[in-house]
Amino acid sequence: MKTMFILALIALAATSVVAQLDTTCSQGYGQCQQQPQQQVNTCSALLQQCSPTPYVQSQMWQASGCQLMRQQCCQPLAQISEQARCQAVCSVAQVIMRQQQGQSFGQPQQQVQSFSQPQHQVPIEITRMVLQTLPSMCNVNIPQYCTTTPCRTITQTPYNIPMSATCVGGTC
């Protein structure tokens, strides 16, 4: 039961981080600006309708609705570097830890700040659960050092990492 709860929190946290950090480039200038996306609703539905557990996953993810929601939640993670994925895993673990402590998500601006500057040390069991679930759920590789390096070390250097970028008239 505790594992199901943590898996549900992983899916919710991953989708929240992706939704908050989704970016679009302004036309003609090539500068990325953060814009809130409606992926939060899609990912919430994914969490409620499509189980992230490996046993049920093979049957549930075959439904076209689940496939679409999975694509909208996981595609941005596949588009960033492996180093950025490692940091994203830590960010997801931090969000889960805050949820377990009863803290609210706050405003998107606050989440972006916590992405680059963690305020709490993430328990290793939460990080391990994210490392075991997120890569397989989204079919992405996570660098080996993510499994051995504490999140506080990985995220000490702030990175400006857009989880997804669509550029019109310029480059990001």
UniProtKB/Swiss-Prot annotation:
<keyword id="KW-1015">Disulfide bond</keyword>
<dbReference type="InterPro" id="IPR001954">
    <property type="entry name" value="Glia_glutenin"/>
</dbReference>
<protein>
    <recommendedName>
        <fullName>Avenin-like a4</fullName>
    </recommendedName>
</protein>
<keyword id="KW-0758">Storage protein</keyword>
<keyword id="KW-0732">Signal</keyword>
<dbReference type="InterPro" id="IPR016140">
    <property type="entry name" value="Bifunc_inhib/LTP/seed_store"/>
</dbReference>
<dbReference type="InterPro" id="IPR036312">
    <property type="entry name" value="Bifun_inhib/LTP/seed_sf"/>
</dbReference>
<dbReference type="Pfam" id="PF13016">
    <property type="entry name" value="Gliadin"/>
</dbReference>
<comment type="similarity">
    <text>Belongs to the prolamin family.</text>
</comment>
<feature type="signal peptide">
    <location>
        <begin position="1"/>
        <end position="19"/>
    </location>
</feature>
<keyword id="KW-0708">Seed storage protein</keyword>
<dbReference type="GO" id="GO:0045735">
    <property type="term" value="F:nutrient reservoir activity"/>
</dbReference>
<comment type="function">
    <text>Seed storage protein. Not integrated in the gluten polymer through disulfide bonds, unless incorporated by reduction and reoxidation during dough making. Increases dough strength and bread volume, but decreases dough stability when added into a base wheat flour.</text>
</comment>
